[in-house]
Amino acid sequence: MVIIETLPLLRQQIRRWRQDGKRIALVPTMGNLHEGHMQLIDEARARADIVVVSIFVNPMQFERPEDLASYPRTLQEDSEKLTRRGVELVFAPAPADVYPQGLEQQTYVDVPGISTMLEGASRPGHYRGVATIVSKLFNLVQPDLACFGEKDYQQLALIRKMVADMGYDINIVGVPTVRAKDGLALSSRNGYLTAEERKIAPQLSKIMNALAEQLSNGERHVDELLEQTAEHLRNAGFTPDELFIRDADSLQPLGVESQRAVVLMAAWLGKARLIDNQQVDLTL
């Protein structure tokens, strides 16, 4: 495995693989890798000759400087995990290489609608930062496919719309959420949980699944369902942050023609902001 930190060296290596007719998969990450990331890599490996993993803590998608500063940087440990997984290349640039003129002078990629709805409404600029860095990685790596986790449902929808709108010839592969045995979705943020909070954390997915079951059984009073769910979360020890029930395909409010719903949840537990989602078939 090779670790590349500069754009010219990355382009050089990608050009060689392209000349050899290799099929390339990209797995974009911010590092601090866990088993969920490994599942993305395994999916990429099954679909391509070459797997490229990017590790870049993107300052453009952080609202608060203290959050950016405190985000774990674990390149050595990550590299060891990726070597064992058989990854061919890790792209780990410095912010100055990605944004040489600084963030203020950087050209942005803005995906209208999705980037400012739901979670984007309370995190202005976040999804613009995501779209910009992913677009830049697509241009640099020129992958045939890219793998993203379904845990961040809105992000996956954003990337798919960007690819369609911009005409990228890249297959976007959504990989199901990886969970611990007790149901908690794997996340780098889980490391912020205390031992006691970790015992409480699986209640998030249980409460979410209960809501999904009510939808599956025909309940459609969305506001009442969300109020009940918020109360269940508070009783379990969480501070609800974002709770939505939306059409799984459009992310718009449920309508009479909606065939699939998605429950989107974000809640604070101590210092950890946990997110999760569950899709529901409304046609059964």
Swiss-Prot record:
Specify which residues bind ATP according to the UniProt entry for this protein: 30-37, 149-152, 178, 186-189
Positions with a binding annotation for (R)-pantoate: 61, 155
Looking at its record, which EC class is this enzyme?
ligase
Its cellular-component GO annotations read: cytosol
Q: What's a single GO MF annotation on this record?
A: pantoate-beta-alanine ligase activity
**Subunit structure of this entry?**
Homodimer.
List the protein's name. Pantothenate synthetase
Organism of origin is Serratia proteamaculans (strain 568)
